[in-house]
Amino acid sequence: MAKLSKKQVSARAAFAGKSNLAVEEAVKLVKENASAKFDETVEIAMNLGVDPRHADQMVRGVVTLPNGTGKDVRVAVFARGPKADEAKAAGAEIVGAEDLMETIQSGKIEFDRCIATPDMMPLVGRLGKILGPRNLMPNPKVGTVTMDVKAAVEAAKGGEVQFKAEKAGVVHAGVGKASFEIEKLAENIRAFVDAVNRAKPSGAKGTYVKKVSISSTMGPGVSLDLGSTAAAQ
């Protein structure tokens, strides 16, 4: 096991014995112990009472965080003609068709969000095994298969976050940067939790939100009081 740095030891001591904190208190603790040389991302993990292997228990959705993510999101768009021009004008870094497909197939994935016009989906569908596991596959349910390319690109760059339950029923996302003010991070966290609550699938039984935790990129995690997140159901 790698030896912990003094900062990591100090952070673990600060978190020891603390759990089920109010959102603002937890955010303050995470911010105080985000000691990396870069601006760490504040990440949220929600443990849900679902089994995503069943179609009626899949949790998927999108939310625009009120204070943005603090991240420079790189967008790729599958489109041709006027829609390709529209994507470029909206700020998409990568725009293409067959050429973009070949780039992705070669293993070069230099984007955080992938958008496609509906007519491009037969082409994009060939990339399912590459984009799917990375949660990059365009999907009409989250607005990334659309003719309104301009709006989709602007949303991706304006603080929109996609989420999807993993096999164990856990949803992960970045909800801001450690440099954000406590109040702004708290607003983002509550907005994210609310969106996941609204995405509750019809097949979910029993307790839906079991646990909510936050951490910084390099720091320990702490669980939140569900009542303070408005997650209790």
Swiss-Prot record:
InterPro entries from the UniProt entry: Ribosom_uL1_bac-type, Ribosomal_uL1, Ribosomal_uL1-like, Ribosomal_uL1/biogenesis, Ribosomal_uL1_3-a/b-sand, Ribosomal_uL1_CS
Taxonomy, superkingdom: Bacteria
GO cellular component, one term: cytosolic large ribosomal subunit
Keyword Repressor: yes
Keywords: Repressor, Ribonucleoprotein, Ribosomal protein, RNA-binding, rRNA-binding, Translation regulation, tRNA-binding
Sample GO molecular function, one term: structural constituent of ribosome
GO biological process, one term: translation
Oligomeric and partner information: Part of the 50S ribosomal subunit.
Alphabetical list of NCBIfam families matching this protein: rplA_bact
Record-linked HAMAP family: Ribosomal_uL1_B (MF_01318_B)
Family as reported in the entry's similarity comment: Belongs to the universal ribosomal protein uL1 family.
Function: Binds directly to 23S rRNA. The L1 stalk is quite mobile in the ribosome, and is involved in E site tRNA release. Protein L1 is also a translational repressor protein, it controls the translation of the L11 operon by binding to its mRNA.
Annotated PANTHER family: 54S RIBOSOMAL PROTEIN L1, MITOCHONDRIAL, LARGE RIBOSOMAL SUBUNIT PROTEIN UL1M
Name of protein: Large ribosomal subunit protein uL1
Organism: Paracoccus denitrificans (strain Pd 1222)
Taxon lineage: Bacteria, Pseudomonadati, Pseudomonadota, Alphaproteobacteria, Rhodobacterales
